[in-house]
């Protein structure tokens, strides 16, 4: 049963990749530039890729429509808004059933402190990224939020000392 869950996920990813058009060099440059500064106007973006604004606008809209650009968002400084602690938390579920996996994925969607969640292979089932104000607030979060999720079997917290790199983008070959 566990194998069929992974098989379905992999097949879904392959289908997603097949349903997109290929990127040319200009599309790639647009994506790279927008990952660094999505606040650019179409005119500024066009100047950087050496095209007129109209075709750049059309390309950008196509990249959005086809899902290459998922969304635009502001990157907020966690420390300035009072979240001084970043924790990477490995989670192991009690059992590997489709119902428990789905239950966990559904529950984390409603927890604001969890900013990222990855279904992983290896010793743990999920890796979550959690922001907290301080150690005491993380302890309360762990006990009162994560501790109440029935499908969690165990967890392992890793406290980030310093962020040495975070481009918040993906490589565009």
Can you annotate each of these PLM segments?
Residues 1-173:
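A compositional/biophysical signature of low hydrophobicity enriched in polar/charged and small residues
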